[in-house]
């Protein structure tokens, strides 16, 4: 006699940490649709020369796959330092650079070292949703304060809350995801003058920004500023999962205390180095994407949408009577964009010209039925 199958266990059956119960994992929808404009990747595929270089480099590394990789990734960090020196105009050495599996691992290591029980991190929302998730995962108290109307950073309000709360970690995302605005060096200096711990400037979209990189502030504020970046956006290397930071060498010494051993595989290291060798060709698409972003923004505004001015490779736009319903209407027309949880707004990645055209055609139809009554306003209007 066959016994009845046991029911499959659920999370409720597991001895999960109580602070994780009821929470949802991070992640954008990954759907097979004709137009995918939801995760802010560079839509331009790698050149054949880059593909060939990656294949050759991985093949050469494969003969040593029975050995652990260079745990400090010195060659990769040297290449990243050379790229940053050329891109930002600030002299950077390999000892100022640290790399990991995407910038999220970088952020996690930072909070493992500088956050934790009894410590506080502050962010200005809406902003990158992984900041509070990583804070929770490291038992760092998360405090959030709202951005100004129009989603810009109110620097005076930021200074006031940092002065009052005295957090151990402050997050500034520039350009901000999901709203798109950059923060000037003048504003960052004002904030750094009152930050008691460290300021993490998240520059995941830094190559698109009209503002200079905050790496120029590291020499001036060596114990207080760290800049995080990624190769997943402008660098068209999202599948390679490579993030990095720039800071004073002592801060990197602190991360060595919490990083996992051999965290960055030899395959990842050589593939990322190959991508860096082709940086000039890959980043040639940045100007094209900026021009497309501006074209899309103007078209959306002409349809009656409110478009938040962006310094990244995406636009936040609205105002919808029901943003989740509007998101579904885009999907029904074969266009996947992102509902980032801001009431009345959706975010669209800047894609290839034909992808943007498909998005705009869908937007024209949706504008006729889904906009809130007071939505029509010029680009950037508050």
Swiss-Prot record:
Its EC number is 2.6.1.9. InterPro entries: Aminotrans_II_pyridoxalP_BS, Aminotransferase_I/II_large, HisP_aminotrans, PyrdxlP-dep_Trfase, PyrdxlP-dep_Trfase_major, PyrdxlP-dep_Trfase_small. It is an enzyme of class 2 (transferase). Transmembrane segments: none annotated. Keywords: Amino-acid biosynthesis, Aminotransferase, Histidine biosynthesis, Pyridoxal phosphate, Transferase. The keyword Mitochondrion does not apply. Pfam families: Aminotran_1_2 (PF00155). It catalyses: L-histidinol phosphate + 2-oxoglutarate = 3-(imidazol-4-yl)-2-oxopropyl phosphate + L-glutamate. Disulfide bonds: none annotated. Residues 9-22 have a biased composition (Basic and acidic residues). Pathway: Amino-acid biosynthesis; L-histidine biosynthesis; L-histidine from 5-phospho-alpha-D-ribose 1-diphosphate: step 7/9. The modification N6-(pyridoxal phosphate)lysine is found at residue 233. Belongs to the class-II pyridoxal-phosphate-dependent aminotransferase family. Histidinol-phosphate aminotransferase subfamily. Homodimer. This is Histidinol-phosphate aminotransferase.
């Amino acid at each position: 006699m066959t016994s009845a199958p046991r029911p499959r266990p659920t999370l409720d059956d597991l001895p999960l940490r109580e602070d994780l119960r009821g929470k949802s994992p991070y992640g954008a929808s990954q759907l097979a649709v004709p137009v995918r404009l939801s995760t802010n990747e560079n839509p331009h595929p790698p050149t054949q020369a880059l593909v060939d270089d990656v294949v050759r480099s991985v093949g050469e590394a494969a003969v040593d796959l029975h050995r652990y990789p260079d745990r400090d990734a010195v060659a990769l960090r040297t290449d990243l330092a050379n790229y940053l020196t050329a891109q930002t105009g600030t002299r950077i050495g390999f000892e100022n650079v640290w790399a990991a599996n995407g910038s999220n691992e970088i952020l996690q290591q930072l909070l493992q070292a500088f956050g934790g029980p009894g410590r506080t991190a502050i962010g200005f929302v809406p902003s990158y949703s992984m900041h509070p998730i990583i804070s929770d995962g490291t038992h760092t108290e998360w405090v959030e304060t709202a951005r100004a109307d129009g989603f810009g950073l109110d620097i005076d309000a930021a200074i006031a809350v940092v002065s009052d709360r005295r957090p151990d970690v402050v997050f500034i995302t520039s350009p901000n995801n999901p709203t798109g605005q950059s923060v000037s060096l003048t504003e960052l200096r004002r904030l750094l003058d009152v930050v008691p711990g460290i300021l993490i400037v998240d520059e995941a979209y830094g190559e698109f920004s009209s503002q200079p990189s905050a790496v120029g502030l590291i020499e001036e504020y060596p114990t207080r500023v760290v800049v995080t970046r990624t190769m997943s956006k402008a660098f068209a290397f999202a599948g390679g999962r490579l993030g990095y930071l720039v800071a004073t060498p002592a801060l990197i010494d602190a991360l060595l205390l919490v990083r996992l051993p051999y965290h960055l595989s030899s395959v990842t290291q050589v593939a990322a180095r190959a991508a860096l060798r082709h940086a000039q060709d890959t980043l040639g698409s940045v100007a094209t994407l900026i021009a497309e972003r501006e074209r899309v923004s103007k078209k959306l505004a002409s349809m009656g949408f409110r478009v938040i001015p962006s310094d990244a490779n995406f636009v936040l736009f609205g105002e919808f009577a029901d943003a989740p319903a509007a998101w579904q209407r885009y999907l029904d027309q074969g266009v996947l964009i992102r509902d980032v949880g801001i009431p009345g707004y959706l975010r669209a990645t800047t894609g290839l010209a034909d992808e943007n055209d498909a998005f705009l055609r869908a937007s024209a139809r949706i504008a006729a039925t889904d906009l809130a009554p007071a939505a029509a306003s010029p680009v950037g209007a508050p």
